[in-house]
Each structure stands twice: as C-alpha cells, then as structure tokens.
Amino acid sequence: MRLHWNDLGAPRAEQACGKTVELSGFPLTVLPTGSADHFLMMAEPGCCQGCVPANRLAVIEVFADQPLRLGTGRLRLTGTWQVSPDPDGWRYQLRGAEVKPGVTRRALMAASPLFCLPAPAMAQAADGTAVDIHSHAGNLIPVSFGRGQFSAVAEPMRQGGVSTICLAIVADSPTIKLTGGRLRPSRDPRPGELYEWSRRAFEQLHALAREQGLPILRTSAELGAARASRPSLIVSSEGADFLEDRIERLDEAYQRWALRHLQLTHYRPNELGDIQTEPSVHDGLTPFGAEVIRRCNQMGVVVDVAHGTYDLVKKAAAVTTKPLVLSHTSLTGRPEPWTRRILPEHARAIAATGGVIGIWPVTAYFPNIVAYAEGFAKMAELVGIDHVGLGTDQLGLVGPSALPSYADLPQLAAALRGKFTADETAKLLGGNYRRVFQASLG
C-alpha cells in the first residue's frame, strides 16, 4: 500500500494500521549520523535539527530492526504502519522499516547534466579565485571546546581552487545546545563569559592559520591578490555576542584579531537583534545593532545578517552605507516556522544594498552537486547574478553537505558552467564577495 503525506490525519492513514506500506520522506535524527535504527521522517527537508514540525500528525516515527543508511536526500521506506494511542507522542509509526531499493528517475535526471560535461569542465575549478564566505573548516568548533585537533584546510583549498575562506568562530557557543530537537539558547551568558570565550576562539583561529601557513587577510588589496596557490583566511565571527553591549570591543577585535567579517546574530537573540529561529524580542535590529553596523562601515568590516529576521534585515539595510552579506542560506517560496531559509523579499532586501547571499549545501535541500548548482541558479534568477555567492558552512552544518570538501569545488564549478558562462561562474564562486569586500574595506 502506498501512503502519501496528505493521507496523514485522514481516514486512509488510520485504516492502514497493521498493513505493509511504502512512503517517501526526509529523515531527521537528533544528532548527525549516516545511519540509524530510530529516527523521524518528514514530508519536507529541514535545514537543521531545529526544523521539526510541532504538529504530531505531520511526522512519522521510524523503527528499523537494523540501522538504515540515511543518505543525503529523500528516503523511500517500506514497513508496517502503526497508529499510536500515546497523546504525547507522534501519531504515526513505521515498524520494521526497510529501505526501498532502486534508483529513482528523479535522482538519475538530477545527476545526468554532469555526465554530459566535457572532461576539461570537470577538471577545472573557478580559476583559483574562489571565496567561501562562511566556514568553520579545520575542525575549529570542536577545537574551541578543547576536543580533537585541527584538520587540513590549506591542502583541500589548493586542490579545489579556493583562494580564501571567511573562517568563523562561534561567539555564542557556550550558551546554545540541542533542546527538543532544535539548536536554541540554553541559558543567559554570565557577564564577560562570551567575551572570554571568543577571545580564546580567536586565538585558536590564529593558531590554525599559523600551523597551516594560511595568511590572514586585512585589506581589500590582499584579497584582490589572493589565489588558491597560497590559500588565505578572512577572520570572521558568527555572532557579535562577544561585544556584550560594548562598542569598543569591535575596535579591539579589528586591531587585535584582524576581524574583517562580522555576523550580527547566531542562535540567541542578542544585544544586536532578533533571529529567525526564536520569537522576536527586539522588533528586529536594536539601537546597539545599528551602532555596530555604522562602526563596521567606518572601520571596514563586512556586515553579515545571516540568522537575522527579515525585520532585522530591513532595518540593517536602512542603516548601512555599505553592501550587506547574508552568508549562508537558500531560497524558499513559502513561510516556514523557525527556518533559516529566506523568502524572496528577504533576498531582495540584501540585493538592494548591493550585497551578496551565500548559498549553503544542505543536502536536505540539495542532495547532490547538480541540485546545489540549481540553488545558485534560482537565487540568481531572483536577485541577479551579481548578488549570489558560495557559503558552505564547512564543518558547521548539523547534517551532511553536498560539498563536503573544498577539493570537490571543481565539480560545483562544472555544474554551474552548465547554467552560467565562465565569467558568471567566477562571480558566483568569489567575484561577487570580492566586490563587497572592496566596497566595505575601501
């Protein structure tokens, strides 16, 4: 028996209890994993563990006799359908679940453009000038917590033709955690806590740069000259929480840590404004947030409004005199609760400042390189070729990535060349951000 998602909550789903059924959906686990014997399945992909529908009729709880390989996209399952009487649990369960074998026509059609590309296109990266505008590469987040060691950054960048990455510390890390399936603020920070945390994280970032021979860029001229033969970093912070309402700390980060790219918010509504994944408390951007934007404009720091609400973005656009960046997201055509994706009007607000929107390779939305390239194409069609960039969130995604290594960038470049000219592809993979960096730093 084949079930469809619009059957849930209807008599057909109730009548299927005890029967063998088949259905397709997107898996969601509490923690990132390649296989599991217990997980949730949803009709639409979520960008992170936070994207769980509150409606108990909109999710299927899956139980398997052995771990199932989850893959990176839509999963076809068969099993015994059960209707749970537990009022506090999910209404529908799939027991004894197994993966339905076979290659779908859709998957084959999605991958087929790469089969037709000439060998030179597959082998050629952007041209050695690619820039990733949002990254946590090098195992930076775990190392900041004292876990593990740095992983290779420079060599994969050279292999893939990536000249520069905006390498970000995570300023609110000590105060966020996975709660109820969502990354959320877990407590208020202690006075001075996030400043001290960020200071140590900046130290780790600089240590990684020294260890792997990665120059830290401080001027637009340096970025203009950057090439993949000698990969480099731009110091970034995901969240301005380390400021703790003290504007002079922005000057300190600029001078001491070479901060040149600042994302205002992350996973806690902070002193600068509201975020997409929590209820609004500031009506968008705060007066302090506006002050930080003005100071960034004066000093020469790129302003990144990723994670901020649409109200925050509108107010930021009214304040800034320089282009805004929204470093990692993708386009959605409908409002979604707590999503990190953005609606067309949100994207247009960034483009209207002359800014750039980074497309991230979340496999729930883009299960392969060809689909990822289509994400670039859809955004470019909406806002124009000059306002789209590469924002991989390398080693920061809670799930798999369609671009797991910088060494894979030639595949993305080849897929983009199936949709864009060589010059347009170069803009998408770095040229547009280079323009914004130049405009911001002078």
Regions found by a protein language model. Name each.
Residues M1-A107, S112, M122, F366-I369:
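OB-fold and OB-like single-stranded nucleic-acid-recognition modules
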Residues V52, A316, E336-T339, I369-V370, ...:
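Short, well-ordered secondary-structure micro-motifs
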Residues P118-P120:
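N-terminal signal peptide c-region/cleavage motif recognized by signal peptidases
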Residues M122-W360, A364-F366, F376-A380, H387, ...:
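Extended, charged catalytic domains and RNA/DNA-binding interfaces, predominantly
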Residues C166, V388-G391, A426-L429:
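Conserved active-site loop/cleft motifs that coordinate metal ions or position small ligands
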Residues W360-P361, V383-L403:
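Short acidic/histidine-rich active-site segments
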Residues I369, L397-G399, L416-K419:
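Outer-membrane beta-barrel pore domains
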Residues P404-G442:
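Mid-to-C-terminal alpha-helical segments outside catalytic/metal-binding sites
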